[in-house]
Amino acid sequence: MGTPSVSEASALLSSGGGPLLLPKQKGAKLYCSHRHGRRLRTSGAHRNCRSRSRRSGADFRTRTSLSRRSRLILYAGSLVPRELTECAKAGATIRSSASMTLEEQFALMKEFYDRGQLVVRLHTGDPCIYGAIQEQMNFFDQYGMHYHITPGISSFQAAAAALQSQFTIPERVQTIILTRGEGRTPMPEKEKLSLLARSQSTMCIFLSAGVVDQVQRELLEHYPPTTPVAACYHLTWKDERIFRGQLQDLAKIVNENHLTLTTMIVVGDTIDNREGLSRLYSHQFKHLFRK
């Protein structure tokens, strides 16, 4: 709490040590792509349009956000609450990309970019993890549109905080797997859940509430039935809900509570674990800062 994050450090580096357009804040995480001069920049944005949001560890003297300065806000309407665009300046164009094709999105962004106007592209979580931004970068590269991506907080990280759990345990679990269940998009054969489950690592499963029965079957091939699980719905949203249980009941938990694709499934003994001490602060452990 109050510890500078990777996103904050990246933003400070990008600004050359100057004031931040958007201070570090705590809430639902988004990403903004915007053009400044002849450059498209991407930086972390949060649920900050209204003062009801919680904030921590930041200097709020600079209150101007990217969204308040933009002429176009193109947000992922299927994942981003409309209320997060309410801080836009009067007269700004606000569009949901949910019903748009890629070509329509590109044409709209380039139209504003070519006018020299600020463009904001809102994504949830970290856009580099299941963010579908590769095709956008291809487009920007094709037309020589410069851009910058600032890392942010993914839903698996938000899940760890909401669960108040450390996803690694000294000498027991040192691996975190980010993956998804097989749906309409096939999984590579070597990345099947049943294969990944062999390590019994902490597994964070994206986009898989709709195939939870299959997910449970594959995980049970290697994880014990009593392995702790958590189904985390709408993490960081106002209607966030978290359901804990055991792996043998995962499908029941998800189905009975009508959880949707915006659910992060976490599996592993690290959930609610309070055993195992790190050697980092042991009086017997010597390192650069303590000899």
What does each model-found stretch correspond to?
Residues 2-11:
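Extreme N-terminal basic, low-complexity initiation segments
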Residues 6, 19-150:
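Class I S-adenosyl-L-methionine
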Residues 12-13, 17-18, 24-48, 104, ...:
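A contiguous loop/helix-start segment that scaffolds small-molecule binding in enzyme catalytic cores
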Residues 55, 126-199, 241-244:
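Class I SAM-dependent methyltransferase SAM-binding "motif I" and its flanking Rossmann-like core
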Residues 77, 98, 151-153, 182, ...:
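Residues at the C-termini of beta-strands that transition into short coil/loop
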Residues 79-81, 128, 155, 211, ...:
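Alpha-helix capping/helix-boundary segments
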